[in-house]
A protein has these predicted regions:
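Collagenous Gly-X-Y triple-helix signature in extracellular proteins
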Residues: 2-209
């Protein structure tokens, strides 16, 4: 006998401050894969997916990227990794300030570690090669374990905006043994490396804790 399994989708209006408190109290009811739809101050709609969570925290990443291509580093160098990159500055200045105030107020400042032993504090960041793929093909950035959500290749594919076309986007990691290339994810959800001065899309990634 065949079995029909149906998924019930519910939509609820949320208040970021209240949700953040529930996340801290472990009473949010969120689960990996849940989506919160939000708009930037200039009207760009994005779906923020819960990709990972634990006691007192939840990590959100935009299902797709913002419709702007940016260089990892304008000088075409990868020295210093994400911590010293132009793309980190872009995310934490231009993109962060484009988010609604209610959301900005609950995004945590977190420490992000990288392959050269350095770390930096930021509110918005990019996933590393190891978080996306587990094994690192291009970097030596194995600081973090693979996020369960990204074990499904389809979840690594991001469009150039909500409702757009699958596109390339930067990861945080830089290519080992090469001074000019950084890791990116292609439109099929696979990892490659590209020159730091090239413009690629970026997702919005943050933690509430």
């Amino acid at each position: 006998m065949a079995v029909l399994t149906q998924t019930v989708t519910t939509e609820t209006t949320i208040n970021w401050e209240e949700l953040a408190q529930k996340i801290k109290d472990n009473t949010s009811g969120l689960k990996v894969g849940d989506i919160i739809t939000e708009k930037t101050l200039d009207g760009e709609e994005m779906d923020l997916v819960v990709v990972d969570m634990g006691p007192g925290w939840a990590r959100f990443e935009s299902k797709d990227c913002l419709p702007v291509e940016v260089a990892y580093n304008q000088n075409n160098r990868n020295a210093g990794g994400f911590a010293d990159s132009d793309v980190k500055h872009y995310l934490n200045e231009e993109v962060f300030n484009s988010l609604p105030e209610e959301l900005r107020n609950v995004i945590a400042e977190v420490e992000r570690k990288q392959e050269n032993g350095e770390s930096s504090l930021c509110r918005l960041f990019l996933p590393t090669e190891s978080e996306l793929f587990g094994d690192c093909c291009y970097s030596e950035d194995s600081t973090y374990s693979q996020i369960e959500y990204y074990k499904d290749r389809r979840n690594r594919i991001k469009c150039n905006r909500k409702g757009g076309s699958p596109d390339w986007y930067w990861a945080a990691s830089v290519r080992s043994g090469n001074s000019a290339r950084c890791v990116y994810v292609d439109n099929y959800g696979n990892s490659y490396s590209w020159f730091a001065s090239n413009g690629l899309c970026v997702p919005v990634c943050f933690v509430i804790q």
